Amino acid sequence: MAPLLGRKPFPLVKPLPGEEPLFTIPHTQEAFRTREEYEARLERYSERIWTCKSTGSSQLTHKEAWEEEQEVAELLKEEFPAWYEKLVLEMVHHNTASLEKLVDTAWLEIMTKYAVGEECDFEVGKEKMLKVKIVKIHPLEKVDEEATEKKSDGACDSPSSDKENSSQIAQDHQKKETVVKEDEGRRESINDRARRSPRKLPTSLKKGERKWAPPKFLPHKYDVKLQNEDKIISNVPADSLIRTERPPNKEIVRYFIRHNALRAGTGENAPWVVEDELVKKYSLPSKFSDFLLDPYKYMTLNPSTKRKNTGSPDRKPSKKSKTDNSSLSSPLNPKLWCHVHLKKSLSGSPLKVKNSKNSKSPEEHLEEMMKMMSPNKLHTNFHIPKKGPPAKKPGKHSDKPLKAKGRSKGILNGQKSTGNSKSPKKGLKTPKTKMKQMTLLDMAKGTQKMTRAPRNSGGTPRTSSKPHKHLPPAALHLIAYYKENKDREDKRSALSCVISKTARLLSSEDRARLPEELRSLVQKRYELLEHKKRWASMSEEQRKEYLKKKREELKKKLKEKAKERREKEMLERLEKQKRYEDQELTGKNLPAFRLVDTPEGLPNTLFGDVAMVVEFLSCYSGLLLPDAQYPITAVSLMEALSADKGGFLYLNRVLVILLQTLLQDEIAEDYGELGMKLSEIPLTLHSVSELVRLCLRRSDVQEESEGSDTDDNKDSAAFEDNEVQDEFLEKLETSEFFELTSEEKLQILTALCHRILMTYSVQDHMETRQQMSAELWKERLAVLKEENDKKRAEKQKRKEMEAKNKENGKVENGLGKTDRKKEIVKFEPQVDTEAEDMISAVKSRRLLAIQAKKEREIQEREMKVKLERQAEEERIRKHKAAAEKAFQEGIAKAKLVMRRTPIGTDRNHNRYWLFSDEVPGLFIEKGWVHDSIDYRFNHHCKDHTVSGDEDYCPRSKKANLGKNASMNTQHGTATEVAVETTTPKQGQNLWFLCDSQKELDELLNCLHPQGIRESQLKERLEKRYQDIIHSIHLARKPNLGLKSCDGNQELLNFLRSDLIEVATRLQKGGLGYVEETSEFEARVISLEKLKDFGECVIALQASVIKKFLQGFMAPKQKRRKLQSEDSAKTEEVDEEKKMVEEAKVASALEKWKTAIREAQTFSRMHVLLGMLDACIKWDMSAENARCKVCRKKGEDDKLILCDECNKAFHLFCLRPALYEVPDGEWQCPACQPATARRNSRGRNYTEESASEDSEDDESDEEEEEEEEEEEEEDYEVAGLRLRPRKTIRGKHSVIPPAARSGRRPGKKPHSTRRSQPKAPPVDDAEVDELVLQTKRSSRRQSLELQKCEEILHKIVKYRFSWPFREPVTRDEAEDYYDVITHPMDFQTVQNKCSCGSYRSVQEFLTDMKQVFTNAEVYNCRGSHVLSCMVKTEQCLVALLHKHLPGHPYVRRKRKKFPDRLAEDEGDSEPEAVGQSRGRRQKK
């Protein structure tokens, strides 16, 4: 056993026969006769070039490696049991696996199997153990083998490190640095770092033992022999055996393999060879032929053959070992230069030297190496074994070059070396002759004989360009070395050294003959070396001058390069800014996108309409879906449009969303059916189909357009997109919406969207969003201005401070220096004197403590300020982030309500769309031009390429959103350079989808950056890249699908449930006489046909008590009598009117019944049933009643309703209490006539009974007629266009009839009679009656004033009343208060109403008249404010006629004075006053 030199074993000197050793090396006991040999060997052993064979530690001295091997040997004796040796060595011998794999395999074999000869315990019982020894291992059965293979595959390995790799890395590192003479201390530190005790296992291994569990034993069966007795027990399972000795860990196994085997060669597949002694000891089987495995070993063991064959490569094995080692070492070895043309080969067996019986001694071998190489090279030669070029040709091919090598050496020597000379002196002669062989500079230029030998022996190295014959060996070596190692990082420093050496040796001619790749490298290195020489010979002044010139030249070059680069960039920029017609440019073809997937039955051409509807719902979701319902998506809508049964719920929900906004707008005020507004009819999923048909009738559109044509503004533009073909509406009369075709459904949806776009709600919504956006921008600009002002102030302040510091700096510095000097001078002697005194020491300590305390306080204060500043900065940062977020959201919402435009167009005029998340993906629209679009451009005019959106948008079916937005893209590009020469072609409208990031990147790559259209498209796509990627990912999400539902069955079921619900509520609320609920329910459930349902609805209407009906179903039997009752002519007119109205009611009811009988769809029946529901006074229902006295619900059997005021009373809450419900009509004490109340109290006043009765009759009749008037007032709006206010009807219905009654004619005579002086004395009854009448009149007044306030509220909401809502300011009109002396506006009137300033209706009307008079006086004829005044006054008159019919409105209109007269005499004219908005000034 001996340490390794490189990767080869270095043989020890054999003991001298029969002589006493003169010089002995202590640790190896090698003996030498001469001091020279001894010292040479000691010097070699002291160098750090040795490697421990057992541990792989490198950079050691021979003694350190030797001691480490001895330590490993002792460790193996202790830790590695002998019975594992054969098991492991059989696996290792001739194995080609790596060391780590061998260690893992051997360790796993040891851990999962008992070895033959292993001593262990055999468990017989629970506590009985027998000492046994393993004799035989039975092989596994097939099933067990398969199971163990799986287990062994998954077995875990303990962590370990590869010593070979570590040694190689360390040697590589040492090879990169040229080793010079180093300190002994440095050598010791390197030694300590490199040395590694084998007994100290790594911590990673110890930790690993805790982390993982050892593998389980394989289910082998064993034959065991008892140690105490000579008995063998067969087939013992592994579970019954217990290991007594700890098996070796992986580190120990690694030491064992390295200690007893060596790898034959340096290749990855080189076999491991176990020492011969152990092979013989354990009879290890050979897996290769001995000669094939190691021809050198074979020759060494057969010396007679070697002597005969002088041309064999192993004539001199010690020399072969040396040459192999040198081939793995640094390329600077001159011995390699002469043989660079030869083929490299693998070294033989590492054990060959040890066992060889060659005549050449190791001293001769070392002496040769010492004389050939410098000491610096020796370091790299021996301790850096690397897989160089020789490792590339293993196996048999290594024979030939070695033979050639030996042959060439023999020829060059001119003699044969015997190889078995034992004398060291003879050995020392051979290196001298070989030194001549090694220096072949003369040979390369000399005889032909010398140059032929290397060429014959293997040829030149393979290079890309064959070098010239006469290239020096240094150049040849560089070419070969560069080719083999140019791409290797670990060889970079070595390659640099070779290049430097070659650059020094070669002449300029030789450098010129090098290959191109190497020529530049060598030339640059040569110039660098020459520069270093010149630099070394320069003086300091010359160097400074040289550097100065160099800098100037460099600056000049840099300036020139920068100038050239700027010019080049400017030219490139100008070239890139040029734009050309896309179709005239040549570039990559655009990628082919796939068509948008649409369900069966929905053609691809309709996708644009689907996207338009969904995008409209998404953009206006704040208006249409304020309660944040589930959004409508394009995929679901397409499925609903094409589905047979699944689309009912989804489509009707879309219709409900759209109609909710449309019917509540002023634009739908005139939409009605059978005298009832559509907004009054309940809007549900089941009635929406019929309501859509009623909304889209042409009659409604024509009435609306005719009515709005009279307006002065442009609100009433005629749109064709909001109309639907009559065929579709006729189909809706006989079929439901979900039963139409996909195209018909889509056309109806788009028409509804366009109709909603015309509403005032949408206009208000857009204005609100834009106003919010403008306010956000104002805030942003204000914040930016404030920040800029702060920065400017800080900058100014800093400049002033710097100027002050510059002025005072010099003086202060001068004074400060002198003061400091004085202080130092004064202070020093004080310190010296005070240091000697104890008192001064105490004082100084106190002063230091006080100073430290102050410093702590200062630090705490500074820390507190710092924390506060940080908190303030964090608060400001959060505030800014929130403001930025609100700003971005507001701007995005403002953009949403504007016209949606495409991202851009490509060379073929295809449009690219990116919609909201509900329509995910990047869409490409082809064939979007149709007949209604006038697409043209003008070569001479750069301002217009399209005739304008207004020219074609009204005629386009998809002009408002989504599908066909304006062509702003082309317009924007044409304003810069008018280079477009092509127009889009008409064709089939198709939609394509880009649904992957790869396709998007490919599209961006194909778009031409200089195309007039594609350049803009590319820029916008790149800008919105992340948004597009997000949309593409959303498009990949699976659709949840629609809920399947049979539409007809759904309509039928809900019609039944609605009928049952109405009947039940009528019965429970006491509003009608309905048969038994169970019988009615059974009858309704049995109905199937529409005709039967119609009869049931008609019967249900007939069962409602007449006085609980309202609207067109309310009876009109009594009308209000005029105040002039004596006129017979007026009575006749009144009778005629009464008859006409009764006929109208009867005809409206008959029309309703006829419509029910003729209904052909369930949705139509739902609408007609909804009309009946709206005509029932549900607020009169007993279900909602509370006792007026105790304000409690419950005890319905004891609750009674007043037939006049409909208020509820408990029987026991009345005074006097009632004990049972009275028959017939009943009135509460407040509604009872005065006579009845007096009679009930037992008082008799016969003198006034007749007059009171007549008064009561008249008042009762009058109150009934007035009540009937109020019931129908919400259904008769005299030409007004206000939004419906359903809540007002509920307020009016709870007003007591006594308060609603008009002025009673019998009150005035009473008051006059009471005022006469000769009247009889007033008794208590008359006082009571007087008080009662006063209360009634005050109640009536307060009710009328309440109605005035409601009228004013409606007037303020009226859209034409905007000029009169607030007072006019001086900013709006400077001369307003010079003309108008009594200004008045609705806000002032509202304030007076809320403060109770008005005592009568006439005072209220006076102020209202003043508002309109002011407007007439101030504004000129034709003013927009005057038109608003006329409409607002008409609205007021209609509301007064409806709510306060007893108060006529008459205002005398003033003639307009000339302007001068009005200005001069405006203050003196009492009636020439008015009010208007200052924004409409006089012309």
Swiss-Prot record:
Alphabetical list of SMART domains matching this protein: BROMO (SM00297), DDT (SM00571), PHD (SM00249)
Localization, UniProt: Nucleus
Coiled-coil regions listed: 533-586, 768-814, 850-893, 1245-1283
Biased composition (Basic residues): 384-395, 423-432, 1282-1292, 1301-1316
An example Gene Ontology CC term for this record: nucleoplasm
Disordered: region residues: 145-212, 302-333, 379-432, 446-470, 788-817, 1237-1326, 1455-1483
Reported impact of C338A: Loss of tyrosine-protein kinase activity
Free-text tissue specificity from the UniProt record: Ubiquitously expressed with high levels of expression in heart, brain, placenta, skeletal muscle and ovary.
Cofactor(s) needed for function: Mn(2+)
Disease: BAZ1B is located in the Williams-Beuren syndrome (WBS) critical region. WBS results from a hemizygous deletion of several genes on chromosome 7q11.23, thought to arise as a consequence of unequal crossing over between highly homologous low-copy repeat sequences flanking the deleted region. Haploinsufficiency of BAZ1B may be the cause of certain cardiovascular and musculo-skeletal abnormalities observed in the disease.
Record-given protein name: Tyrosine-protein kinase BAZ1B
Species this protein is from: Homo sapiens (Human)
The organism's taxonomic lineage, starting at the top: Eukaryota, Metazoa, Chordata, Craniata, Vertebrata
